[in-house]
Amino acid sequence: MAFTFKQFHIDDMNCGMAVGTDSVVLGAWAQLTAAKTVLDIGAGSGLLSLMAAQRCQAHITSVELDTSAAEACQHNFHNSPWANRLTLVNSSIQEFCQQIEYQEYFDHIICNPPYFEQGTQAIQSQRAMARHTDSLSFTALLDAIHVCLAPQGNASLILPMQSMARLNEILAHSPLSLIEMTNLISIVGKSANRVLCVLAHKTHPQIATKISDITIRELSGQYTQTMVQLIRDFYLKY
């Protein structure tokens, strides 16, 4: 399926995961303004990378394991206004971290990671890979962030609320810490079902975790004003 945003176009037909609200919110919410280098782990169609390219002047490196998704991602990059600042690497993040030429620090890392650690695999293999942590465990993801993140850099993720206990369990023994979390509420009156997270090295000066909420829709089904402000630079409707 194809999606047209204000400044770029996405074709995600050969990608395991289609363009969705999770990635759009993460791409609009991540604090990218000062970043000169950005790493997108599990780039898929390239949506997060393209949103980052629109929002800041950074050079963006996008790592995608699946070959079909990587081809779609490269196509989307080539047709964007920022092709000269977007670099695609078709490999696992583990292989990426081991390549000497890529052992550099990134000011910001962004990722909408696989989130089903257990359960029945999806029938479509690409979708299964995109949705299950079999292809990228939390531990492997945090190890990659630790290796690639600049000393004062941040990493932005979006996770299901039920994954937070596991994340915190791993962080307790990790050189990374959770410095910010924004609870994402689908509609007024509901409990949060997603969490936007910011990770940093434990040497980061900020210690206490900053906590906030974002509600996506009013009871009427319309986007809240907070959500509109977040996405207005991307959605044609606004």
From Swiss-Prot:
Identify the domain of life.
Bacteria
Ordered alphabetically, the record's keywords are: Cytoplasm, Methyltransferase, S-adenosyl-L-methionine, Transferase, tRNA processing
InterPro entries in the cross-refs: DNA_methylase_N6_adenine_CS, rRNA_Ade_Mease_Trfase_CS, SAM-dependent_MTases_sf, Small_mtfrase_dom, tRNA_Adenine-N(6)_MTase, tRNA_adenine-N6_MeTrfase
Purpose of the protein: Specifically methylates the adenine in position 37 of tRNA(1)(Val) (anticodon cmo5UAC).
What is the name listed in the Swiss-Prot or TrEMBL entry for this protein?
tRNA1(Val) (adenine(37)-N6)-methyltransferase
Q: What class of enzyme is it?
A: transferase
- Annotated family: Belongs to the methyltransferase superfamily. tRNA (adenine-N(6)-)-methyltransferase family.
Chemical reaction(s) catalysed: adenosine(37) in tRNA1(Val) + S-adenosyl-L-methionine = N(6)-methyladenosine(37) in tRNA1(Val) + S-adenosyl-L-homocysteine + H(+)
Q: Which residues form a coiled coil?
A: none
Identify the EC number(s): 2.1.1.223
Q: Name one GO cellular component term.
A: cytoplasm
